[in-house]
Regions:
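C-terminal catalytic/motor cores of large multi-domain enzyme assemblies
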Residues: 1-200
Length: 200
């Protein structure tokens, strides 16, 4: 196979269901055209719909797979993977397609009380990256030569080295840090949109 550049950024966000007893997910399309605040609002809206049962393809897929006898699940999964990933067809009734899992997956395990975690890439998903948020905790850190208490939020990432390497992961970490240190940047439109505005 070969690496094909995506036309858009689709962020998949893991969502707690039924008080944390189950996990589902919501997808945010064209995330590269939104500010962080717009993305957050979309996540809230889609998560509320998923929890109410109005928009939850993930849970429907899990329910469908659960009905298949265990010995045959792997065969069914491999068949779906071949149809969607290798042949490029969509199975709309199940919400499956070559881009079913989006461009990047975000999961907040801190909501389950876990300080830190590391995700494994799911081969059938074609996900190049998974970012895990841990639990925000007070930690002792050094600032201006003094030990002080600060709130620390652990972030870990798992990346597909066929698509990206340590340099790209480092650039992602650099920009996350930059945006967190300069929160006013979160309200800015992406550079691509600014350029389009200037040209128009």
């Amino acid at each position: 196979g070969q690496v094909v550049q995506r036309d858009e950024v689709i962020v998949t966000v893991a969502v707690n269901m039924h008080g944390g007893k189950e996990m589902s997910s919501v997808k945010i399309y064209d995330a590269h055209k939104m500010t962080v605040f717009e993305i957050a609002e979309k996540i809230r809206s889609r998560a509320a719909k998923a929890r109410s049962g109005d928009d939850n393809a993930t849970m429907e897929n899990k329910s469908f797979m659960a009905k298949i006898p265990w010995p045959f699940r792997r065969m069914v999964f491999l068949l779906f993977r071949f149809i969607t990933n290798s042949l490029g067809f969509q199975i709309k009734s199940l919400g499956l397609g070559h881009n079913a899992f989006g461009s990047i997956l975000l999961s907040n395990i801190g909501s389950h009380g876990l300080s830190m975690g590391f995700a494994a890439l799911f081969p059938g998903s074609k996900l190049p990256a998974v970012i895990i948020m841990g639990k925000e905790e007070d930690k002792a850190v050094v600032r201006d030569g003094k030990i002080v208490i600060r709130k620390i939020l652990p972030l870990t990432g798992t990346f597909d080295h066929r698509v990206m390497d340590g340099y790209h992961g480092g650039m992602l970490a650099h920009h996350i840090k930059r945006y967190l240190e300069h929160a006013e940047l979160l309200a800015e439109a992406p550079v691509e949109l600014k350029e389009e505005t200037v040209k128009g």
